[in-house]
Amino acid sequence: MSTTEEFRRNSDNFCYRHPDRQSFVLCQRCLRTVCPECRTPAAVGVICPECMAQQRATETPAQKKAQRRWSRSAPMAAVASGRPVATLTIIAITGLAYVIGLVPGVGGIISNALAFYPPFLVPQFGPIEPWRLFTAALVHSGPLHIGLNMLALWFIGRNLEPLLGRWRFVVLYLLGALGGSVAVALLAPTTIVVGASGAIFALFGALLVIGRHIGADIRVIAVLIGINFAWPFVVAFISSLTTGDFGAALANVGVSWQAHLGGLVVGALVGWIYARTRLLRQRPVQIGLLIALTIVLFGLLVIPVVVYY
């Protein structure tokens, strides 16, 4: 163990540009210590001012133009520390809901009250329970299910939340969960669904659109979206080679591709709204468009009620 005096003498424990500021965060490129004022969030970790300048020097004209167009406005992010508080909070709440769901006797009742089942939106089947449209994102079928979803949420959220700001990120997540549930009601009205996959795909969709808008390389994101969306179909196809029934095989995979699709589409729309209304004076327009999108999503729920029930 090092003594306090040894700690103070070690310059690696302080920002290289501000020697009086203690920090333990390193630039991902040059590995120099940087304080909160000197760090710029990157796809992985943070970048110091010098490395950021070098990166901008190698940007293409299109990327520079997109960056100027984005940064001309007031910063979207309101998280000065860069800590993804909303992301961590969502993970904590979801984890707590999963733990409660494991409690004998009580857990099953609570999980059943939170899961989404489209008939609960139809008056003739009993009291309407609209909260299920959102709370299904809190319920997971097993440790692997919640583990993969929360891992994806962490990797995307820690990069996307500082860019959008906490409240925009939360709105995106909730609308993604809503979009996934609406898609299930439209495309699989007799299916019970649980999980945050719809909301996760919404984050992917928003990241894809916003990344394209600022001139970032979105190929990796696009590939990840394609792989995650396609894999239940691939598994079902392989399984159907022996059974001959692709539809039944797809249903037995246990993955709601409908929720994935709904979340992805809604996330892309929200990302487009954020990218197009980033100016401070456009905030009323942004809020209005988000409200309009929410109304449209709830309005779409009339279709399964009329068609299926």
Where are these regions (language model features)?
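Canonical RING-type zinc finger of E3 ubiquitin-protein ligases
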Residues: 19-30, 37-41
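Long, low-complexity, intrinsically disordered cytosolic termini of multi-pass membrane proteins
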Residues: 1, 8-11, 20-22, 34
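A detector for small-residue-rich transmembrane helices and their helix-helix packing motifs
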Residues: 2-6, 32-33, 37, 41-309
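The −1 position to Zn-ligating cysteines in a subset of zinc-ribbon hairpins
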Residues: 11-14, 26, 34, 47
